[in-house]
């Protein structure tokens, strides 16, 4: 189906009543992803400090109304082969086959990131890494976004970049 769009994008002005604007949670949770379950809503995010106070990675929050959030600590058990300087980015979680699957990227600083997957029996975790690099042949991959297609199969979008070492340009993979 072809959907025609206005060729000139219009700016959308946010409309927030001053009395409604409030901080839902005062901690750090960059790039949040929210999973709706029968148990409520679970929010996962990136924390630049690495581990949460319980030693796990990726803060996980819970809410029953999306207005009030409670920290549950970290979601991901640190992978055993993790380098001390590893960074972890952009988790997203999908429920399938009676389990919860967390897709995320990991690398050193902002380089060499690859996608990985971890599983748990509860949306709060603890998630345990599968030990599998999902993108071994790609030099830099981030932002995994799994989804169930119309035909019932699972697919994933993600970002990838090839950094050219002889130039200052970024080239995309084909």
Segments and roles (model prediction):
Residues 1-174:
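Carbohydrate-active catalytic/glycan-binding domains of CAZyme proteins
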